[in-house]
């Protein structure tokens, strides 16, 4: 279903990269133009990461079969999901593991009885990912500190805290600050995790 759109996107990006290099587009840009270009290119990267994260989530789901021979990893000759991702993405093990953790946080659950799609662990984080607001760094910055409070803190409280931090990622926080970077998101999430789990 995605094969043709992704192929078209690859061709377009390839043309842009080659053209930008030949035209020395970055060198010729003013500082304000260059800043806008960096921000726009980073947003494109987050959209690409969103597609990759969802794909990794599905690879993980297909590799969770208790029967080893029926796992996607086994079908493709790999020991586990990390090894398969290293092969497919050319990433190192640490980056492959980060992709898996991000996918776990935003992957919608599937009902075992009806096959219906259910909410992800952090719905607002998933929505921010789909909107190109956060990529792998942002997802993990928000979700990792909050996930560490489970099971001592109710899921609803973790989600509410994530919603507040996501507002900061979108630049919609109460202080009117611009969209927060991943490091600031991590600090916000850690603060909420400490507040929710004071005995943890």
Which positions does each model-derived feature cover?
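Conserved C-terminal region and hinge/linker of Rieske [2Fe-2S] proteins, especially
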Residues: 1-200
């Amino acid at each position: 279903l995605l094969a043709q759109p992704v192929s078209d996107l690859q061709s377009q990006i390839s043309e842009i990269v080659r053209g930008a290099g030949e035209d020395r587009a970055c060198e010729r840009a003013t500082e304000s133009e260059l800043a806008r270009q960096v921000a726009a290119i980073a947003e494109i990267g987050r959209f690409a990461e969103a597609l990759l994260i969802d794909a990794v989530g599905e690879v993980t789901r297909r590799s969770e079969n208790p029967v080893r021979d029926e796992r996607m990893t086994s079908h493709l000759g790999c020991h586990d999901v990390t090894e398969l991702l290293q092969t497919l993405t050319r990433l190192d093990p640490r980056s492959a593991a980060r992709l898996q953790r991000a996918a776990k946080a935003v992957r919608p659950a599937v009902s075992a009885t009806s096959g219906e799609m259910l909410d992800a662990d952090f719905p607002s984080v998933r929505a921010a990912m789909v909107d190109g607001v956060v990529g792998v760094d942002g997802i993990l910055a928000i979700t990792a500190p909050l996930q560490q409070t489970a099971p001592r803190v109710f899921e609803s409280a973790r989600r509410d805290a994530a919603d507040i931090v996501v507002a900061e990622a979108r630049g919609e926080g109460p202080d009117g600050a611009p969209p927060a970077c991943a490091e600031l998101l991590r600090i916000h999430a850690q603060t909420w995790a400490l507040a929710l789990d004071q005995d943890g």
